[in-house]
């Protein structure tokens, strides 16, 4: 029977641990800003009526300086909520106008994309919005002058929902 020397046993243990760490890492898919297998939760207590108004983009994901922050105007009409936006999403400017079709608590289908409100502060001054596929995420604020504590809270919520904060950009 063969006996392992302490050095060989240590070497094998290090290799096993390295393999476990490598398997536990979740690389983000190309162009996505969150791990696809991470949990994501929308705000179950969101009051959609309180979303109406003008919002300024104060943060998002993508390369710094790739585009300028934008905003969203949400209106209420006979058909429900409607969004008109110009946003920096993933480092590219996106513009559009579409109904915000309810798709569950805190969840909307906007122009064929899932916009999930992950968090709104208690006074509806700040929103963290994400999408299950991780293609974008952004933070909106009514004033544009977001406080440090609300920005920190939005970052924490995005991280908790699997977003890669190394790619987070504050404007």
Each predicted region: which residue ranges?
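A beta-rich soluble binding module of mature secreted/lumenal proteins
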Residues: 2-4, 15, 20-171
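Flanking scaffold residues of small Cys/His-coordinated metal-binding clusters
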Residues: 12
């Amino acid at each position: 029977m063969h006996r392992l020397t302490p050095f060989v046993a240590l070497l094998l243990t290090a290799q096993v641990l390295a393999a476990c760490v490598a398997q536990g890492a979740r690389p983000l898919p190309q162009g996505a800003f969150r791990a696809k297998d991470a949990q994501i939760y929308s705000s179950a207590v969101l009051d959609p009526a309180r979303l109406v108004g003008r919002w300024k983009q104060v943060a998002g994901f993508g390369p710094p300086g790739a585009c300028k922050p934008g905003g969203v105007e949400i209106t209420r009409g006979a058909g429900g909520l409607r969004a008109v936006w110009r946003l920096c999403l993933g480092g590219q400017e996106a513009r559009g106008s579409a109904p915000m079709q309810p798709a569950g608590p805190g969840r909307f289908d906007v122009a064929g994309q899932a916009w999930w409100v992950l968090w709104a502060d208690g006074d509806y001054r700040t929103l963290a919005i994400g999408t299950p596929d991780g293609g974008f995420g952004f933070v909106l604020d009514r004033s544009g002058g977001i406080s440090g504590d609300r920005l920190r809270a939005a970052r924490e919520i995005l991280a908790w929902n699997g977003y890669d904060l190394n790619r987070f950009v504050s404007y």
